[in-house]
A protein has these predicted regions:
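FIC/Doc superfamily catalytic core
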Residues: 1-220
């Protein structure tokens, strides 16, 4: 299916229109996963005029982050931690960087702590350095790229390196990794709609690896 999509994209004369349209749709859906809700109408209006709707601004920041990441990957053929930091900075409009303070926990809808990510700043830096190598060094792992993408996504979300924007940054990394591997020429895969449709299963799959080592459900 990815090869089919890649072939179809090559027949479209104006890639910028396609990138702009699909990045806004992906941005809207990715943000909805984290309950940042806006309408397409709001987005297209905000794309051409200044407004103060915070939800629209967050979604537009996602679209800008995705496009910025795509340009980096296309030009440098790498996706390094310094690039991931730039993408998250675009999403959150701040320079907080990787977490340095303890206290971050993931809670469910009942306000119960379901996962505590690494708290020590040096451990976070070491884990992200390891992930950077896994993303960019083909000799580090010879797994199929789609399997690697699932592992990268799990590792990033479990390290949870930022104070905020981890989910959205992680979903941008998914798309950029497919571009990096040559499976996509443009960042036009609309992954977040699928996650919205299977949101409970998505979070269960991530948690299943943490609690039971169940990689199969996440990867498949």
């Amino acid at each position: 299916h990815l090869a089919e999509l890649k072939g179809v994209v090559k027949t479209i004369p104006n890639e910028q229109i396609l990138i702009n349209t699909l990045s806004l749709q992906e941005a809207k859906s990715s943000s909805e996963i984290e309950n940042i809700v806006t309408t397409h109408d709001d987005l297209y209006k905000e794309n051409i005029m200044i407004d103060t709707n915070p939800a629209s601004k967050e979604v537009l920041n996602y679209a800008k982050g995705l496009k910025m990441g795509f340009e980096i990957v296309r030009n440098e053929r790498l996706l390094l931690n310094k690039h991931i930091l730039l993408i998250q900075e675009q999403l959150e409009a701040n320079k907080a960087g990787f977490r340095t303070q303890a206290g971050t926990k993931l809670i469910n809808s009942y306000n119960e702590v379901v996962y505590t990510p690494p708290q020590d700043k040096d451990e976070i830096l070491n884990l992200m350095a390891n992930l950077e190598k896994f993303i960019n060094d083909p000799e580090f792992s010879e797994l199929d790229p789609l399997t690697k993408m699932a592992i990268i996504h799990y590792q990033f979300e479990s390290i949870h390196p930022f104070y905020d924007g981890n989910g959205r940054t992680g979903r941008i990394i998914n798309i950029l990794y497919l571009v990096l591997q040559g499976l996509l020429d443009l960042p036009v895969l609309y992954l977040s709609r699928y996650i919205i449709q299977h949101k409970t299963d998505y979070y269960k799959a991530l948690q299943g690896v943490r609690t039971n080592g169940d990689w199969e459900t996440l990867i498949l």
